[in-house]
Swiss-Prot record:
Biological process, per Gene Ontology: nucleotide metabolic process
Main subcellular location of this protein, as a coarse class: cytoplasm
SUPFAM superfamilies, per database record: ITPase-like
Keyword check for Hydrolase: yes
This protein's UniProt keywords: Cytoplasm, Hydrolase, Nucleotide metabolism
Keyword set includes Repeat: no
Name of the featured protein: 7-methyl-GTP pyrophosphatase
CDD domains membership: Maf (cd00555)
Function: Nucleoside triphosphate pyrophosphatase that hydrolyzes 7-methyl-GTP (m(7)GTP). May have a dual role in cell division arrest and in preventing the incorporation of modified nucleotides into cellular nucleic acids.
Reactions the enzyme catalyzes: N(7)-methyl-GTP + H2O = N(7)-methyl-GMP + diphosphate + H(+)
Length: 199
């Protein structure tokens, strides 16, 4: 079997790293230094796609030999983009807004292999229908889970599932921040063996 090229995750997210570890993809994490500001009136779809590409390209410039994965996510409620709350008060506010509503999570993913001249990217949507949440439930959840670094103010891999009525989408991993099924498509197109000897 041909030796796999290095795989780099252009992120400091422990959630994305954990997903790659679960599927036994040996990788290195190198955070990309890119401006993550959203352009005025930039649609959420375009925003996450642009950032996923920018993160992968930034790291690929330093490591052209590697397959570099970039990813970014936004939560959208109506026309409003919900970012990472950063504080308990903001997390409670976001969850109160999402109560009884459908929030669409858009996750951009990009794979860049500069040496091979390959660039692939896509956006994977995933919809979460929230239960009607009372103030006490929201406060307890935020205090216990501390979802301050998560778009939409919850962790679906933890207690966050108690907040949901139902979920819709092709890849539940997209909700955690890295759509593995689409990523596998990209890696296979680059000739990267997904199941092979671990280093």
């Amino acid at each position: 079997m041909a030796e796999r090229p290095p795989l780099i995750l252009a992120s400091r997210s422990p959630y994305r790293r954990a997903l790659l570890e679960q599927v036994r993809l040996p990788h290195e994490a190198i955070p990309a230094d890119v401006d993550e500001s959203r352009h005025p009136d930039e649609p959420a779809h375009d925003y996450v796609l642009r950032l996923a590409r920018a993160k992968a390209e930034a790291v690929a410039e330093r490591r052209p030999d590697a397959l570099v994965i970039g990813s970014d996510q936004a939560a959208v409620l109506g026309e409003r983009v919900l970012g990472k709350p950063g504080s308990e008060a903001r997390a409670r506010e976001q969850l109160a807004t999402a109560s009884g509503q459908c929030v669409t999570f858009l996750t951009g993913v990009a794979v860049v292999h500069a040496a091979g001249g390959r660039r692939q990217s896509d956006v994977v949507p995933y919809r979460v229908h929230f239960r009607d949440l009372d103030e006490t439930t929201i406060a307890r959840y935020v205090a216990l889970e501390q979802p301050l670094d998560c778009a939409g103010s919850f962790k679906s891999e933890g207690l966050g599932a108690v907040l949901f009525q139902r979920m819709e989408g092709s890849d539940p991993n997209a909700l955690i921040g890295l759509p593995l099924i689409r990523l596998f498509d990209f890696l296979l197109a680059c000739g990267y063996p997904l199941i092979g000897s671990e280093e």
